[in-house]
Amino acid sequence: MAKAKFERSKPHVNIGTIGHVDHGKTTLTAAITTVLAKAGGAEARGYDQIDAAPEERERGITISTAHVEYETETRHYAHVDCPGHADYVKNMITGAAQMDGGILVVSAADGPMPQTREHILLSRQVGVPYIVVFLNKCDMVDDEELLELVEMEVRDLLSEYGFPGDDIPVIKGSALKALQGEADWEAKIIELMAEVDAYIPTPERETDKPFLMPVEDVFSITGRGTVATGRVERGIVKVGDVVEIIGLAEENASTTVTGVEMFRKLLDQAQAGDNIGALLRGVAREDIQRGQVLAKSGSVKAHAKFKAEVFVLSKEEGGRHTPFFANYRPQFYFRTTDVTGIIQLPEGTEMVMPGDNVEMTIELIAPIAIEEGTKFSIREGGRTVGYGVVATIVE
C-alpha cells in the first residue's frame, strides 16, 4: 500500500512498545502492522525489517529506533520500537521519540523482569502518561492460574510506580502466533488496538496549551520599544495578551504584547512553531534576556531545585572519560541558555560513570522556567556530556 494513501484526517497519537529484552516487543510491533494491514490500515512489516532499526544520530547520540505507522478505524498512530535497552533510556530521556502512551510487553512465561521495572520507572519519570499491557507468549502457558499470577504481578508493579495498576487494560495474547496468521491470536491484536484506542487519550494539541516562548534574542526599536524574538514552543499569542517574563530573576515581570511580527510582517497572532518577534510594552532592553521565557500569566513558574532523570554520555559518544561525583558543577542548558548548577546524587550512589543513567537532584544558581517533563542537556565548556528530563520540582 502506497504511503500517499494514508488519511491524515484522523487524530494522531504517538505510541511505543516497552518492556524487557526478548519479551516480544519487536514481534508485537510486526504483528500489529501485519494484522492491521489486512484491514488496509498499515503496511505489513516483518520482524527483520523492524529489528534492523537504523541507528539515528540525535544530537550526537546514537539511538537505534524503528518507526512504523499504522491506523485503526479511529486514529493514525506513529509507533516506535527500540532494539536495545540503552536505546530506550536515551530515547525517553532526550524525547527523541515522544510517547503519548506505551504498550508494555511482558512475557507470560517469564513474568516481570528487571527491565520491565526500569521501563515502568522511566515512563513515570519522563511523563509517559498511559500504559496498556500486552501479556505475550500466552500460547506457551497452559496454566490459567499462572497467567493470572503474572497479570497480578504486573499490575502491582505498575501501581508501585504510580500508574493505576488496577484499571490498566491487560490483553493476553501471542504476537508470534498472530504474526503467523492464527485467527484466534490475531483477534487478540485487534483487541489490543481497541484498548489502545479507548484507553490512551488523544493528546492535547500544542496550540491548545498555554502560550510559551523561549527568548532567543532581544533588541530595541527606537520609538516602539523592546522586541523579544524566539520560536513559539506552545500555545497561541495575540496582540493585547498579558504575558509574564520568567526566569533568571527574583520576580516575574508582567507585560502586554503590543505587536507580533513574523518575517517582517505584522500579525494579529502567532502559534506553536512560529518564529516571531514580540513587541513588549514598558519593558526596558535590560529587563529581558536570552534564557528567559515569555509565557501566559500564571501558567509556569521559575524553579531552581528539582529532581531529574539523567543519561550521561559515554566516552564514545563524545562525553566524559571519567566519572563525576556529588557536588559536580556543570552547566545545564535549558531551551536557549546555560545555567550553572550543583548535583546531589541519591543515597548510596558514590559516583556516576559515563554511559550511566541516574536520578539526581539539581540546584541551579538562578531559577529557570521549568515544569515536570522539561528537557535539558548537561554541558561542560560548551560540550554536551549528558541529557536529562525534569521528573519532580523540589522548590
Curated annotation (Swiss-Prot):
Localization, UniProt: Cytoplasm
EC number: 3.6.5.3
Region annotation (G5) ranges: 174-176
Cellular compartments per GO CC: cytosol
UniProt xrefs under SUPFAM superfamilies: EF-Tu/eEF-1alpha/eIF2-gamma C-terminal domain, P-loop containing nucleoside triphosphate hydrolases, Translation proteins
Region of interest (G2), residue spans: 60-64
Spans annotated as G3: 81-84
Gene3D superfamilies in alphabetical order: P-loop containing nucleotide triphosphate hydrolases (3.40.50.300), Translation factors (2.40.30.10)
Binding site residues for Mg(2+): 26
Residue ranges of the region described as G1: 19-26
Residues reported to bind GTP: 19-26, 81-85, 136-139
TM region(s), chain numbering: none
Start and end residues of each tr-type G domain: 10-204
Keyword presence, tRNA-binding: no
Family annotation (Pfam families): GTP_EFTU, GTP_EFTU_D2, GTP_EFTU_D3
Alphabetical list of CDD domains matching this protein: EF_Tu, EFTU_II, EFTU_III
KW Protein biosynthesis (keyword) present: yes
Substrates-to-products reaction catalysed: GTP + H2O = GDP + phosphate + H(+)
GO molecular function: GTP binding; GTPase activity; translation elongation factor activity
Region: G4, residue numbers: 136-139
Function: GTP hydrolase that promotes the GTP-dependent binding of aminoacyl-tRNA to the A-site of ribosomes during protein biosynthesis.
HAMAP family per UniProt: EF_Tu_B
Subunit structure: Monomer.
UniProt family annotation: Belongs to the TRAFAC class translation factor GTPase superfamily. Classic translation factor GTPase family. EF-Tu/EF-1A subfamily.
Protein name: Elongation factor Tu
Source organism of the structure: Bacillus cereus (strain AH187)
